[in-house]
Amino acid sequence: MRIALLDDDLETAAQLNAILTEAGYDCRSFHKGYALLRMLRSETVDLLLLDWNVPDFSGIEIIEWVNRHCDPKPPILLSTARTAAEDIVTGLNAGADDYLVKPVQPEILLARVKAVLRRSYPTPPSDGIEHYDDYTFDVSREQVSLGSTLIPMTSKEFMLSLLLFRNLHRPLSRGYIFETLWGRNPDLPTRTLDTHISKIRTKLNLRPENGYRLAPVYAYGYRLERLTEKKATPIEAVQ
């Protein structure tokens, strides 16, 4: 999970980043609201951890921007030294999903992060079988079927397909997809992702006439959308 952290206090940001990184999260720190907003225009994050009092853009102003420009918006944790009830209400009403009072204790931070992520991203079934309309994903075997037809796929094609279906209607940045599937590999050709997208679009028949659209998001990445209730046919999907 990728977390973006905004705090203008360098020491606090470093401490929070270390706690989250040690817990296994991919955490990126920002000390100015403008820098965070610039990143959000081109990258996907799974959670925002925002300090209320940042000089150029307050946490509340960031939340308002996210509400207007991110669809769907990532879950948001708001952190601040303010403890008055009216401040907490203001933060939650603005769109924060939860509220942390500074100084933040590591165990409370991790518990709140896990709780917000759990609510926002449901845990996949324990048997490893996931259903999306007529598409069935067997995670342990890395196999996907359309109806009763097994679709031949490479491991990376399967992982990319599952990532897109798990994030249906959510735009995913190229950087987010690259890091999720290939890690941080600067030597990977830039067309690698586009090639994989083209292949799974054909193999899974992700086209408007079959109720789905897998389309690029300009200067950002890709998004898989369900358009209608019409179902894809297995024969077309494997051509």
PLM regions with names:
Residues R2, A115-P171, G175, Y218, ...:
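Short, Lys/Arg-enriched segments at the junction into DNA-binding effector domains
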Residues D9-R28:
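Two-component/phosphorelay signaling modules centered on CheY-like receiver
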Residues K32, S58-E61:
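Acidic catalytic/metal-coordinating carboxylates
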Residues E64-H69, K73-H131, K203, Q239:
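Basic, amphipathic DNA-recognition helix from helix-turn-helix-like DNA-binding domains
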Residues V54-F57, E86:
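Hydrophobic residue at a beta-alpha junction
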Residues E43-L49, V54:
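Active-site beta3 strand of CheY-like receiver
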Residues Q105-R118, P152-L162, D187-R207, P216-R223:
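DNA-recognition element of transcription regulators
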